[in-house]
Amino acid sequence: MILIAKGAEAEIYLVDWFGIKAVLKWRKPKAYRDHTLDYLIRRRRTINEVRNMYIAHVIGVRVPAVYFFDPEKTTILMEYVEGESLRDLLSRGEHKYLKDVGIYIGKMHKAGLIHGDLAPTNIILSKGELYFIDFGLGETRRGWTRKTAILMARDINVLLRTLELYGAKSEEFKSLFWSGYREEMGVRSSVVESEVSRIRASGRYVER
């Protein structure tokens, strides 16, 4: 078992599962929280993450296969997706996948699924296909309300902020993303775009 990532909420290990490379995600306890409350939060987030991944899979967004999860131990055992992150691809000037990224995010948002952390490191190209990983901060919304549109706008703003790091190419990158998103979301795209503009105009770059 090899530790490959360590975040504020969880530790990620590369493990051997019956001869297959797999990822074990463990939500670690928070010493500053009440023990019972901490456990309930970690348990709920573990269940929510698996549910969000299942929804994404059902609507046609590629995610790691979940082999097993244990809410009591707050662990998820899932497929190890080998490939390059969107960040690495963009750093090499490969931006042709950005329209597809927009389409897949549109699929999630149409289903009411908010990813929660659309950093380019959470989008992986593996064997020519895009995968979305790390739904730990995600949530599912029912119905179409302004609150839902705001959450979607915050979701997208995380990605847009990163795309802006690419200087002169950033506008082209954002245009490709929006073309895919609009294609999938249809008329509701304009509502989300308005909320994105509102967030950015006010300077409230929300990080979740």
Regions found by a protein language model. Give the residues of each.
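Residue-level recognition of conserved beta-strand positions in structured domain cores
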Residues: W17, W26-K28, T36, F68, ...
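Conserved kinase catalytic-core helix
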Residues: I55-V61, R87-T121, S126, L130, ...
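Conserved structural core of kinase catalytic domains
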Residues: A31-Y32, R42-T46, H57, V61-V101
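C-lobe/activation-segment region of protein kinase-like
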Residues: Y131-R208
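Conserved catalytic-core motifs of eukaryotic protein kinase domains, centered on the activation segment
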Residues: H35, D88, R141-T145
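ATP-binding glycine-rich loop module of kinase domains
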Residues: I2-I47
